[in-house]
Amino acid sequence: MALYSPGNMITVHKTITFDGTAGLGLAGTAVPIFTVTGEVLVVALVPFCTTLLTESGATATLALGVTGSTALFIAATNSVDIDANEFWVDTTPDANGIALPAALKDIVITDNIIATPAVTNTATGVIRFDLVYIPLSTDGAVVAS
């Protein structure tokens, strides 16, 4: 059986509306995006900003990773650099289109996918997260948190 056949790939989506509160942009508190059970292969993870992010104070940052490795996918990025209609695939988000970087595809994980705000709060904005994955273990699954 081919690992990357359309029949074994699953897609899940989650939209986060940041408001600066705990779990939604408060610095130092994780933003839960996807809950992972078992082992899964991330085929592709695509964060797309639909409403630009703002900060409550200078230099608010946002990283994307998993519990225990908070920058596995994307290192800390200044929140105000993530604008509407941009793909947040690295620390310099891109409009229009971009080749998906290696850090956002073909990654094996067992932990929940989270965003980590730091320094000051990410006060407003919206990011949609689209994930395509393949379960590796019999209990491998991902759901929106």
Report residues per predicted region.
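Surface-exposed, low-hydrophobicity beta-strand/loop segments enriched in small/polar/acidic residues
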Residues: 1-145
